Amino acid sequence: MSDPVIKCESVYKIFGSNAKKMLHEANGNVDAKTFQDNGCIVGVNNASFEVVKGEMLVVMGLSGSGKSTLLRCISRLTDATSGKIYIDGQDLLTLNNKELIELRRNKMGMVFQSFALLPHKTVVENIAFPLQIKGIKTQDSINKAMEMVKLVGLDGRENYFPRELSGGQQQRVGIARSLAVEPDIWFLDEPFSALDPLIRKEMQDEFLRLQEKLQKTIMFITHDFDEALRLADRIAIMKDGVIEQLDTPANIVLNPATEYVRKFTEEVPRGKVLKIADLMEKPETENLSDFKVSKNEIIENVAEKILTQEKSVAVTDENNKIVGSVHPSKIIHTVFSREKK
């Protein structure tokens, strides 16, 4: 595995006038209720994790779980109370204001739920604005902005004002603006939550297309589990500032680490989450169906075909080599069973 782009070690964020004193006295054993009784609010409680280059980590939880606070700490929009945060090996908490500004300008892109477009500027002018703030010449910034317009599919609307765009189009401008500075790291805090379901689905598709092309290192905040499942390489589920579980979507659904995670995921349609590789067993040498299926297929996409087979189905890798098998009964049990572990 490559070196982490983002690394957090025992990060705490506690709000309140005596937060540091209480944290010191707690010696790492932070109880949210006890702190609240003493006038402090626990935003992030002992968060430790890494995000590698090109990975998309989706952080999710209910309102007040600490997911947005965690993101703000990692971007240092909010200072952590305690802990270590590294960006490409650089200790974020030791940077002075000038160094922090340079880091944000050159390595970080941010997109929030609020589009925050400048109403008196056109699409291309909004996208070019952060480049001009960096000191890039006007024409060069416009040229770069036009590249971003095409990237997010707004060709022909570059001279529109924000009021002339739909919500989804405005959010595309926000995404293009954040990408214009070519950030290595992309922070997104519920960027699609204000959009209606159809536009939201379109934006998720667009987002996946961009990520496949650009391979950014991403932290994405959402409270929507379906959205997390569609987008994430790994998911972190938070409750009361604590990361309850950080794992692949499949492992979170199949092997919840806590009762809270189990309840969080119990209504998730497994067929939409799991891949054939998550279910396959050792390959049978005989008695296989003629039908073959890739280990990377989402179960929902191939379940109907597998269920028409009487025998186990061969599972293949990228080179069409048989690496396992899956029986139709396994599909039935996984997709339709509601047994509780």
UniProtKB/Swiss-Prot annotation:
Catalytic activity: a quaternary ammonium(out) + ATP + H2O = a quaternary ammonium(in) + ADP + phosphate + H(+)
Pfam families in the cross-refs: ABC_tran (PF00005)
Enzymatic class: translocase
InterPro entries in alphabetical order: AAA+_ATPase (IPR003593), ABC_osmolyte_uptake_ATP-bind (IPR051921), ABC_transporter-like_ATP-bd (IPR003439), ABC_transporter-like_CS (IPR017871), Gly-betaine_transp_ATP-bd (IPR005892), P-loop_NTPase (IPR027417)
Bilayer topology: Peripheral membrane protein
UniProt-listed GO biological process terms: glycine betaine transport
Family: Belongs to the ABC transporter superfamily.
UniProt-recorded name of the protein: Trimethylamine N-oxide transport system ATP-binding protein TmoW
Species this chain originates from: Pelagibacter ubique (strain HTCC1062)
